[in-house]
């Protein structure tokens, strides 16, 4: 007797791990974790040999581990269940549920003529063909009645059987297709809930027909699962997320420095809301409150700006030490077991000072939305050769004699000022007042000369951590650069 929900996440390894797939995996996992007897299964549906790649399999498993979606069973590969699929096919053929068809797509189209009704016309249904190298297998769909899909999100969804054509379940090569392979594996695994994207809703009545047929021919009355078809994820234009145009790869968000906890929190809010108005929802609360019946059937906007805001909140909730540790793959990847893909740190190991980073990390902790932003904000601490924002340099130094005068005065005053943020701030205020400049304008040429940019962490604390010698050298170098 099954005591808890048995759910499976069954992705096809044909590309990067889509954020929609990540949400489906999460919702399955949340349901399983609500019961001590719940079971979360990963089954890789890899029967499409022409499109599957092993690197995509690895990507799925790696991304799920990053998200913390631990497995109770699996990962299994659907291709390992080939004998099970063949046995299911043979039993359905013997019972008359399947028939052989040798029609080509051109022949089907020619018979239709001007009739634009989609689907197969059932031409081979009564021809009693035998298996051959040119015959596929089709399911003989009932010609009458209604198939009702019980959906926890959408209610009962009715499909007139006349609108469901005799669909192919096995190719002429003998390869068993998704519809039958999926049902055979779900029955074997005693799946109780099928939670997936709404694009799979048209498959549900076909799979229910196959499920009932297999129950009959096997004598094993496995209960049909309950379905839950999740709403589409849409972009800012409220169109379905495009794999080509929209940032949909889960791996890319990990590489950009989003925290797994923030990403999971955000995924959970795509179509579902917890009780209350809080955006930050602990995982324990997600598990406790999640109900498929509360998921909306309306499209959910995948808002990267909102995700970034939420991630920033999660980052700011980290302690200083936790933040430093979290930054390690982006600032010192050689010291970690994982590093972001195709993201090179802009300094060498020899230039990186872990202790200096520990001291300056609080300066950027409150200012970044992702960990991937950290290297750009602290690079000037570790690079001997600054990378200048040339437009900024032209604006406040090369093209501004007053900015150059301020820089020369700062180089002279900073040589004797007490080396702490407060003293450096006071000295800059005094120099600016003498030149008729407010603090914002007075510090701009100093910031650009020392950091290469007009934006970044607090200036005077940064100067303190850089040290007098490096700051004075950069001020003088910038003055020389102005006349170059």
Segments from the language model and where they lie:
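N-terminal Rossmann-like or analogous alpha/beta NTP/dinucleotide-binding catalytic cores
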Residues: 1-118, 203-222, 262
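Active-site-proximal acidic segments at structured loop/helix or strand boundaries
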Residues: 274-333, 338, 346-358, 362
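Conserved phosphate-binding loops in nucleotide/dinucleotide-binding enzymes
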Residues: 78, 171-172, 189-200, 234-266, ...
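Active-site cores that bind ATP or allylic diphosphates and position pyrophosphate for catalysis
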Residues: 100-241, 249, 274
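Glycine- and acidic
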Residues: 7-13, 42-46, 189-195, 427-429, ...
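Charged substrate- and nucleic-acid-binding regions of tRNA-handling and nucleotidyl-transfer enzymes
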Residues: 418, 422-482
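Short alpha-helical scaffolding segments that buttress acidic/His motifs in well-ordered protein cores
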Residues: 267, 311, 361-368, 381, ...
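Small-residue-rich helix-loop
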Residues: 320, 324-435
